């Protein structure tokens, strides 16, 4: 189950393998590994096999299959999938099921992808870790003693371990990029509006994005081609960029100006992480790219992000507050209480900071094609071997994933690409950011990073 999504789809379209065979292989992989990983909240074996069988019948009758023909796809459990659980990692929502597909899921199905199940996330996606009150914590395929990150925890773990070829995640503060960096896979947070949110849910925030996770930039680009595009049900959705992301991911250009920011803000990057990222930067320079180290002066954005994110969290649960106080984790309750207590003037000030950060980045993009940073400030965090949790998780946010916040505040695209491992064999991601609307440029440069570091084909031990 480590063939690329592109290879799987091509083989299914050409009849070299059936969609049902691919689906069964994915389900067997889940059965063999998920008792350890806990990537999936719900596996829809029956529905996946039925969908795969329909594709095989259609192909035999002459129907031309789509871009994602037979590709096994995992979906984060906060994204609606018709008939499947949508419990968002919370006891408050236990037993709830969706009665329709999200637009992005419908587009995946229309491209003949096969949804195999719902992946685990921390409660309401409030933290970048892999545990929730609903069950055992999701583990990192590279090391069961370390977090897979979050909040698209199960999605990244499933892709890294070969349980799925692609996954759909969400990102309000790094929730696609954090677990992708931790699990050694590619995660792309598109420009705000590139992938529509439809139907719009309560608590929707302009910091929240839908996006793809895959084992290569090419696979992520192929999925983005399918799920991107304007829809009238999301007023923030964008028209097509007018490019084919999959084609851009195959470009072999070796020119361009890259701004290298080893540190954004005040937090310090772990030496081991920094050395791995520096090796990637040197590889880019050796391949002809112009790399300029920058030390951008940016207004502190962490407080602004926390205000806007916690207001979003509060709006998600405001109609269920009594249940939240009774059933939810203290770390979620703390966020909700903060969000409920935020004053209107504080929101206005946070929005002003958002504009200032946006302007600061835009000035940089006048001189550079992309900005690259270490995705995370430290390697995947160690967890309790029994619970999969870490001590004092709230204290880690600024020290660990501070580099995630700016792209959510500004709506600019950002992609985490694996570039190597630490001395302890834990994955390290490099974040590639581009100006708003420039997803194609980010995909192009992310692919360049991938080629320069020769990561493709690297697998965790659980593989």
Go through the PLM ranges and name each one.
Residues 32, 110, 160-266, 278-287, ...:
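Structural helix-boundary/capping segments
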């Amino acid at each position: 189950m480590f063939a690329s999504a592109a290879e799987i789809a091509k083989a299914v379209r050409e009849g070299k393998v059936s969609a049902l065979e691919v689906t069964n292989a994915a389900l067997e992989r889940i059965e063999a590994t998920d008792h350890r990983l806990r990537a999936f909240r719900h596996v829809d074996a029956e529905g996946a096999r039925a969908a795969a069988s329909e594709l095989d019948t259609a192909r035999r009758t002459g129907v031309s299959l789509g871009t994602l023909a037979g590709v096994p796809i995992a979906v984060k459990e906060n994204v609606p999938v018709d008939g499947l659980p949508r419990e968002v990692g919370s006891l408050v929502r236990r037993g709830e099921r969706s009665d329709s597909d999200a637009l992005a899921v419908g587009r995946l199905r229309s491209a003949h992808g096969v949804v195999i199940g719902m992946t685990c996330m921390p409660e309401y996606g409030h933290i970048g870790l892999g545990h929730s009150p609903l069950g055992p914590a999701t583990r990192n395929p590279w090391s069961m003693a370390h977090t897979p990150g979050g909040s698209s925890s199960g999605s990244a773990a499933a892709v890294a371990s070969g349980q799925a070829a692609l996954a759909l995640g969400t990102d309000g503060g790094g929730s696609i990029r954090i677990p992708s960096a931790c699990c050694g896979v590619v995660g792309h947070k598109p420009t705000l509006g590139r992938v529509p949110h439809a139907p719009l849910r309560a608590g929707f925030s302009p910091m929240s994005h839908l996006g793809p996770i895959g084992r290569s930039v090419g696979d992520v680009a192929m999925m983005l081609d399918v799920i991107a595009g304007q829809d009238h049900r999301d007023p923030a959705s964008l028209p097509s960029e007018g490019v084919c992301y999959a084609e851009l991911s195959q470009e072999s250009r070796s020119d361009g100006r890259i701004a290298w920011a080893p540190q954004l803000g005040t937090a310090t990057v772990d030496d081991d992480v920094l050395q791995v990222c520096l090796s990637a930067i040197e590889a880019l320079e050796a391949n002809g790219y112009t790399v300029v180290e920058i030390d951008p002066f940016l207004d502190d954005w962490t407080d602004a992000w926390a205000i806007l994110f916690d207001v979003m969290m509060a709006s998600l649960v405001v109609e269920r507050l009594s249940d939240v106080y009774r059933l939810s984790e203290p770390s979620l309750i703390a966020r909700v209480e903060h969000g409920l207590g935020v004053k209107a003037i504080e929101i206005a000030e946070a929005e002003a900071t958002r504009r200032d950060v946006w302007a600061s980045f835009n000035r940089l993009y006048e001189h550079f094609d992309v900005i690259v940073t270490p995705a995370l400030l430290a390697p995947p965090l160690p967890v309790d071997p029994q619970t999969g949790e870490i001590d004092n998780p709230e204290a880690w946010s600024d020290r660990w994933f501070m580099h995630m916040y700016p792209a959510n505040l500004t709506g600019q695209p950002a992609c985490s690409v694996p570039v190597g491992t630490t001395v302890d064999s834990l994955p390290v991601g490099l974040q590639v950011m581009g100006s708003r609307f420039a997803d194609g440029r980010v995909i192009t440069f992310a692919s360049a990073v991938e080629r320069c570091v020769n990561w493709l084909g690297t697998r965790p031990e659980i593989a």
